């Protein structure tokens, strides 16, 4: 059974209609540690940027122009449809949610890795379309059995020559 299908089985038990997996970590970094590569684990897409939306019967990956060719190759045969960001004929994630989330649908995600801006946008769409949001669900914890640990390297201060002043 594919990781996507395992994930769908878990989601069904929680009555979640749509689950969003972004590419970021707790700090909204573009390049993340292995622990935060849930989108890659489920979809097989290895690009640094992309957002995965999973429903019981469909799955979509939003990727930008840097990754169109790579995503097409890596998603082939997965059942995940590529949504080409900033390309005519492809809705944004928010447009897709507004057009496809029916009244009383449930959209879930791990709120620790979603940007505040995207959360507020989805919240507004949810209010307009009368669907609910569950932001404290990390289904990856359950389905990714051998998930790498969170990084434990010590933090350090970069010298001003590298970090600049603000």
Q: Across the structure, where does each feature detected by a protein language model lie?
A:
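N-terminal accessory/capping or targeting/presequence segment of soluble
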Residues: 1-102, 114-166
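Acidic beta-strand-to-loop metal/phosphate-binding motif
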Residues: 105-112
């Amino acid at each position: 059974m594919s990781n996507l299908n395992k994930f769908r089985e878990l989601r069904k038990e929680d009555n979640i209609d749509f689950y969003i997996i972004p590419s970021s970590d707790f700090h909204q970094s573009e390049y993340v540690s292995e622990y935060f590569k849930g989108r890659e684990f489920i979809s097989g897409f290895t690009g640094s940027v992309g957002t995965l939306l999973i429903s019981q019967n469909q799955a979509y990956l939003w990727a930008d122009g840097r990754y169109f060719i790579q995503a097409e190759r890596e998603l082939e045969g997965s059942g995940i449809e590529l949504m080409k960001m900033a390309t005519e004929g492809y809705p944004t994630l928010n447009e897709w949610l507004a057009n496809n989330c029916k009244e009383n649908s449930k959209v879930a995600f791990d709120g620790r890795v979603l940007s505040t801006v995207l959360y507020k946008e989805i919240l507004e769409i949810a209010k307009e379309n009368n669907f609910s949001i569950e932001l404290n669900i990390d289904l990856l914890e359950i389905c990714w059995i051998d998930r790498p640990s969170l990084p434990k390297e010590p933090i350090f201060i970069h010298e001003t020559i590298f970090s600049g002043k603000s």
